[in-house]
Amino acid sequence: MAERPEDLNLPNAVITRIIKEALPDGVNISKEARSAISRAASVFVLYATSCANNFAMKGKRKTLNASDVLSAMEEMEFQRFITPLKEALEAYRRDEKGKKEASEQKKKDKDKKDSEEQDKSREVEEEDEERLDEDDQNEEEEIDN
């Protein structure tokens, strides 16, 4: 847990970036206003987390999940955010699935390449052994002659 109230604040760089993205070009914001928005965002996150935790506790779980957060939004009367949040969640899940599939494909490709290299290495070793055997036979034939 946080030892001081300031520890609960969101990073200023993140808040500043979000504010700049939300405002039209050329609009500035005072340090005091940025600080107020930062505190408000921190309070919102804490409140949403507390509400979501209540849903997790009702489900006898210690881990918050997406449905807990969505239920908390509804309980907090932020229904208008539920649809965009669901869309963002689906996009996130698609991205993660794509990353996982890409990672698995990369691993398969690497395994296939490694296997091909091992096969090639075995072929070279077998060819070397055949040459050595031929050389041995030739030496034996020369000795016999």
Curated annotation (Swiss-Prot):
GO molecular function, one term: protein heterodimerization activity
Chief location category: nucleus
Gene3D superfamilies the UniProt entry points to: Histone, subunit A (1.10.20.10)
Keyword hit for Coiled coil: yes
Residues carrying N-acetylalanine: A2
InterPro entries: CBFA_NFYB_domain (IPR003958), DNA_Pol-Epsilon_Subunit (IPR051377), Histone-fold (IPR009072)
Biased composition range(s): Acidic residues: 124-145
CDD domains per record: HFD_POLE3_DPB4
Annotated Basic and acidic residues bias: 92-123
Residue ranges of coiled coil: 85-144
Location in the cell: Nucleus
Keywords per UniProt: Acetylation, Coiled coil, DNA-binding, Nucleus, Phosphoprotein
Disulfide cross-links: none
Region entry Disordered, spans: 92-145
Tissues expressed in: Ubiquitously expressed.
Phosphothreonine carried by residues: T83
Protein's UniProt keywords contain Nucleus: yes
GO biological process: chromatin remodeling; DNA-templated DNA replication; nucleosome assembly; regulation of DNA replication
Sequence positions bearing Phosphoserine: S121
PANTHER family: DNA POLYMERASE EPSILON SUBUNIT 3
Quaternary structure (record): Component of the DNA polymerase epsilon complex consisting of four subunits: the catalytic subunit POLE and the accessory subunits POLE2, POLE3 and POLE4. Interaction with POLE4 is a prerequisite for further binding with POLE and POLE2. Heterodimer with CHRAC1; binds to DNA. Component of the CHRAC ISWI chromatin remodeling complex at least composed of SMARCA5/SNF2H, BAZ1A/ACF1, CHRAC1 and POLE3; the complex preferentially binds DNA through the CHRAC1-POLE3 heterodimer and possesses ATP-dependent nucleosome-remodeling activity.
Role played: Accessory component of the DNA polymerase epsilon complex. Participates in DNA repair and in chromosomal DNA replication. Forms a complex with CHRAC1 and binds naked DNA, which is then incorporated into chromatin, aided by the nucleosome-remodeling activity of ISWI/SNF2H and ACF1. Does not enhance nucleosome sliding activity of the ACF-5 ISWI chromatin remodeling complex.
Name listed for the protein in its UniProt record: DNA polymerase epsilon subunit 3
Source lineage: Eukaryota, Metazoa, Chordata, Craniata, Vertebrata
